[in-house]
Amino acid sequence: MNNQIMTTYIGRLMDEFVQGGVQEAVVCPGSRSTPLAMLALAHQDINVHVLVDERSAAFYALGLAKASQTPVLLICTSGTAAANFYPAIVEAHYSRVPLIVLTADRPHELREVGAPQAIDQQFLFGKFVKWFTDLALPEESQMMLRYVQTAAARANHMSMQEPKGPVQINVPLREPLLPDLSIHPFDREETDRKKVLATGQAYPNDDALSEIVTVMNRSKKGLIVCGELHTQKEKEAVLRLSKDLHLPILADPLSHLRNGHEHAELIIDAYDSLLKDEALQQHLLPDMVIRFGPMPVSKPLFKWLEKHAEVNQIVVDAAGGFRDPGLSASYIIESDVAAFVDEVVNRADQREDTSFLNRWQHANSSFRTHASHYSDEDLSFEGNVYRQLQHLLPKESVLFIGNSMPIRDVDTFFEAQSKPFRMMANRGANGIDGVVSTALGTYAALKQPVTLVIGDLSFYHDMNGLLAAKLMDIPLTVVLLNNDGGGIFSFLPQASEEPYYEKLFGTPTGLNFEYASKLYGGTYSKPSTKQEFHDVYKAHIEEPGLHLIEIETDRHSRVSKHRQMMDDILEEVKKECLLS
């Protein structure tokens, strides 16, 4: 292959990505991907991040794209390199994150003939990518340059079209693989030619709106349930709906509604705990629910909504996805959040009755008041770590939350507050893998201090992700809650099967994580008191570099402490709310 032809062809591909909004590329080293990697680096408008492990790199790219909500290039060589992207692609699919995966490949004549480092990369990621194409080999005709430009434009468009998600372009390349950078590989300035594929905004159907407004006007006990939101516009729209119609908001931590605004009185942050009690479930039962975003993390909330399918439940989803795991939705409305709110607020009757909002506020306030009476000194009880951490986080920072117990504990213990910070997590497929790398990617996008709170098994899964912190000088403060195993299983029925539990589910590793931090050039601390944790965290969060703060907790006693605390608090809440 003439390397000037190849250079122009791949250069046109890269330049069109930039035209479509791409600014970042994550590159994994390899030979067959040489033209893709070098021309990405050569483009003045692409910022290239190089990571040597494909699984970590893919999650890092996921973090970049999740935080920026713009497409990120993810580049690898042929063979099993691309297969290591798979877990992150699955997460991107389910969490609706735009990724453009460029998998270099052998030319067609070297496929299925036993050539080295050649696997079948056609539709490698199956239904987890929105679009796939296998590029033609580079040619020099204007038609083929328009062809490769169109492929890039289409990839940009498809990744950003709702629901956002990953796409794959398979790029076969013949040797020689070194591009000729002496020519001008990006000819936009010469041709001023680009493709524009514009995405639209979903607006609610007028007939459906009329029916929904009728339901809203009849409702006396309306409620908003809010899962993960991505934009300030969405956040402001939900707050407007709540204020205008006096609807309490049950706000998931990832909704960005528990912090960063001055309307904490509208936010119910203790619903996960309140809905564990049957009497309170009935006391707080609505006659209408409007849900934005995916289902929140709270299992009691999910089971409550599932049980009460007789209640009108309206799900608003800009992509029209069927995100209704309880099969209890009465309406699924494909609409932009702000557009939906504008329409229903303008059409719905004005209401003055705040009694149902007050009922929720009373229960929420009662729970938080009684919870504050419990000592938060004992760090071996994980809840106390979260109760303290919420006050330590700096303004304009990011809390990246691990799956399994951390996201549930944040849901339980983090209260609504005005301090602005982001809470993020991988809640598409809810896996415990790739969390460290994703958190590092969020810093690369936002350049804000990042605190990662994570369990020991999840941290172990992605320890090699810490290499990015070392090589790219990314500051990261890790709060590692080490209960030496799978703590979440202690809350599940498996815990009652003592002969099997510890070996199959508890899975203690006995690892000394101090060595992991030192391996990647980080600091290590192991506070045992509230004051020590405060001092160590404050000393490190604004500093450059990797900082590992390990807190040993006890998963064996945690369950009984947690349940006893909840039982005691809920009894007090019921006395105040049901008997007053």
Swiss-Prot record:
Q: Which PANTHER family match?
A: 2-SUCCINYL-5-ENOLPYRUVYL-6-HYDROXY-3-CYCLOHEXENE-1-CARBOXYLATE SYNTHASE, PROTEIN PHYLLO, CHLOROPLASTIC
Q: Which SUPFAM superfamilies match?
A: DHS-like NAD/FAD-binding domain, Thiamin diphosphate-binding fold (THDP-binding)
User: Subunit details for this protein?
Assistant: Homodimer.
Q: What does this protein do?
A: Catalyzes the thiamine diphosphate-dependent decarboxylation of 2-oxoglutarate and the subsequent addition of the resulting succinic semialdehyde-thiamine pyrophosphate anion to isochorismate to yield 2-succinyl-5-enolpyruvyl-6-hydroxy-3-cyclohexene-1-carboxylate (SEPHCHC).
Q: Which reaction does it catalyse?
A: isochorismate + 2-oxoglutarate + H(+) = 5-enolpyruvoyl-6-hydroxy-2-succinyl-cyclohex-3-ene-1-carboxylate + CO2
Cited NCBIfam families: menD
Please verify whether the record's keywords include Metal-binding: yes
Q: Which cofactor does it need?
A: Mg(2+); Mn(2+); thiamine diphosphate
The UniProt record lists the EC number as 2.2.1.9
The pathway it acts in is: Quinol/quinone metabolism; 1,4-dihydroxy-2-naphthoate biosynthesis; 1,4-dihydroxy-2-naphthoate from chorismate: step 2/7; Quinol/quinone metabolism; menaquinone biosynthesis
Q: Identify one Pfam family in the record.
A: TPP_enzyme_N
Cofactor binding remark: Binds 1 thiamine pyrophosphate per subunit.
Record key words, sorted = Magnesium, Manganese, Menaquinone biosynthesis, Metal-binding, Thiamine pyrophosphate, Transferase
In the record, the note on similarity to other proteins reads: Belongs to the TPP enzyme family. MenD subfamily.
Its domain of life reads Bacteria
The identity of this protein, by name, is 2-succinyl-5-enolpyruvyl-6-hydroxy-3-cyclohexene-1-carboxylate synthase
GO MF term list: 2-succinyl-5-enolpyruvyl-6-hydroxy-3-cyclohexene-1-carboxylic-acid synthase activity; magnesium ion binding; manganese ion binding; thiamine pyrophosphate binding
* GO BP, one annotated term: menaquinone biosynthetic process
EC primary class: transferase
